[in-house]
Amino acid sequence: MASYSTNEFKGGLKILIDGNPMVIVENEFVKPGKGQAFNRVKLKNLLNDRVVEKTFKSGESVEAADVEELNAVYSYFDGDSYVFMHPETFEQYMVSQEALGETKKWLKDQDEYQIILFNGQPISIIAPNFVNLEIVETDPGLKGDTAGTGGKPATLSTGAVVRVPLFVQTGEIIKVDTRTSTYVSRVKD
């Protein structure tokens, strides 16, 4: 198995700590006036999204995580797992509801998502930054009603709820930022 020295640490590097795949979020090299240099590293656990801080002595090496990222198309839900298919190899990946997490509310048939595999098993799904979804339910916007916050809740075809401007109506397709769960714009046909 490959390993990385602390000299090679940088943001985005995937390493194995106590059997858990981690990604380096921040790396700070510290050389005190007295004593040995060290790296203060902020790590994000890929299995549960927890962020931890850890220090490594300069020159120490850690094992590389067997993490692979690939794009796959969402096909269908089969009762207990979501099925994604690689567009070129047609290999299917069964993804559990735990691994899917918050991405579930952005799932749309035949859209492409990024799958993160650890030892060949899907551990996380990343939705595209923006998705186009249909509004299935929202209150009608009353003309001249601008006294409030300037928005109203709208339920989308996937079940997600986002705040939209008053002029947006049921049946319209809108663009949503999946990172912040916010309305971006209406989609023109």
Swiss-Prot record:
The modification N6-(3,6-diaminohexanoyl)-5-hydroxylysine is found at K34. SMART domains: EFP, Elong-fact-P_C. Pathway: Protein biosynthesis; polypeptide chain elongation. One of its GO terms (cellular component) is cytoplasm. May be beta-lysylated on the epsilon-amino group of Lys-34 by the combined action of EpmA and EpmB, and then hydroxylated on the C5 position of the same residue by EpmC (if this protein is present). Lysylation is critical for the stimulatory effect of EF-P on peptide-bond formation. The lysylation moiety may extend toward the peptidyltransferase center and stabilize the terminal 3-CCA end of the tRNA. Hydroxylation of the C5 position on Lys-34 may allow additional potential stabilizing hydrogen-bond interactions with the P-tRNA. Keywords: Cytoplasm, Elongation factor, Hydroxylation, Protein biosynthesis. It holds the Pfam family EFP_N. GO terms for molecular function: translation elongation factor activity. Involved in peptide bond synthesis. Alleviates ribosome stalling that occurs when 3 or more consecutive Pro residues or the sequence PPG is present in a protein, possibly by augmenting the peptidyl transferase activity of the ribosome. Modification of Lys-34 is required for alleviation. This is Elongation factor P. It comes from Francisella philomiragia subsp. philomiragia (strain ATCC 25017 / CCUG 19701 / FSC 153 / O#319-036). The gene is efp.
